[in-house]
């Protein structure tokens, strides 16, 4: 939780505790209600979040959870210490990679946004690790640009989303180098 005060999140914490679950709060705000209601807390300390899109706190929370997963994997013996060290080094390199990305995509952003700024709807499709990226991308588009958008698992697109498309609908596909890349590429061909 970014603020640690969202009513829905606090209700989920209460339900989880009533069911006997151990609750971990990952938040940016020290002393928030979520921190008081949880069994353990990880503070991201990402600084004040000014924008509604909460990009900074989202990225910090993903990084915190990834670090937790790496440590658990090391303790359980599913990842050797050397690999954990390598992966933590990759996390630390993210700011430089973000700078490179911003520099490399700026022209494309101008061109693509100029072509699609007046569209009434965007569809995001992804599989595997690309699906949560699509969900967050669709949310960011709604929050920042006020453009209606939705995100779906690409394998489910025939069960509704494809009916929303016409020849002008922008479809954002996140295709990662994953074991199911071929299936994602097939989905991309279907929406062309």
Task: Outline where the language-model segments fall.
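Glycine-rich phosphate-binding loops that contact phosphosugars or nucleotide phosphates
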Residues: 1-93, 176-179, 183-192
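Short catalytic-loop micro-motif centered on adjacent basic/acidic residues
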Residues: 25, 124, 173
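Active-site phosphate/pyrophosphate-binding segments
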Residues: 40-170
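C-terminal active-site/capping subdomain that shapes the small-molecule cofactor and substrate pocket
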Residues: 151, 158-161, 167-192
């Amino acid at each position: 939780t970014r603020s640690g005060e969202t009513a829905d999140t606090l209700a989920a914490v209460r339900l989880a505790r009533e069911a006997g679950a151990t609750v971990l709060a990952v938040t940016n705000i020290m002393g928030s209600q979520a921190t008081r209601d949880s069994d353990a807390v990880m503070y991201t300390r990402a600084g004040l979040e000014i924008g509604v899109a909460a990009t900074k706190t989202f990225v910090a929370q993903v990084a915190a959870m990834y670090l937790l997963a790496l440590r658990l994997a090391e303790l359980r013996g599913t990842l050797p210490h050397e690999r954990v060290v390598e992966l933590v080094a990759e996390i630390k390199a993210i700011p430089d990679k973000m700078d490179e990305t911003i520099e490399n995509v700026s022209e494309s952003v101008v061109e693509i946004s100029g072509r699609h700024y007046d569209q009434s709807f965007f569809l995001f499709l992804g599989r595997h690790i690309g699906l949560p990226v699509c969900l967050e991308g669709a949310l960011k588009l709604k929050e920042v640009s006020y453009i209606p958008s939705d995100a779906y698992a690409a394998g489910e697109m025939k069960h509704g989303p494809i009916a929303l498309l016409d020849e002008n609908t922008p479809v954002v596909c996140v295709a990662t180098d994953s074991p199911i890349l071929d299936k994602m590429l097939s989905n991309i061909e279907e929406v062309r």
